[in-house]
Amino acid sequence: MKKLVKKIINKFGFELKKISQKKKYQINFDDLLKNKICKNPVIFDIGGNKGQSIEKYLNIFNQPIIHSFEPVKTDFDYMYQKFKNNKNIFLNNIALGDKTEKKEFNITAKTDNSSFNKINLGTDWLKERSKEFGTTERGYITSIQKVSVIKLDDYCKDN
């Protein structure tokens, strides 16, 4: 399997190099993106959160056009203040889905964990997060908000 992965990476013009005796390999995916995707791509950032991916893409590409979608209002407002002057970034306070609707969205103490999915009580993951944020498992969901959901196809037709 390792040889196959190395062969595929080599086909893209990159070489895997050992970084330790324990046979770990280092691949710089930023370089892979920069060299194999056009210089000014159109990027859809689904779940923009606070704009971490936008910052990464701005560092990798010259002038990417980024359409970011973030349904959590506080995170959207943060991104808006950060990127409002960049004409190549289109921020959308909306979620994407398979149909246009209003849907309940679980807002968590760590907003990048917020989701349409229900949080499963009693899991190790939830116990750790609750402890990290000084709350109970039930308290980890800070609110449930109705958010607008649209289909990507509809967004592209309109924009």
Regions from the language model: what does each represent?
Residues 2-159:
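Phosphate/nucleotide-binding beta-alpha loop and adjacent structural elements of enzyme active sites
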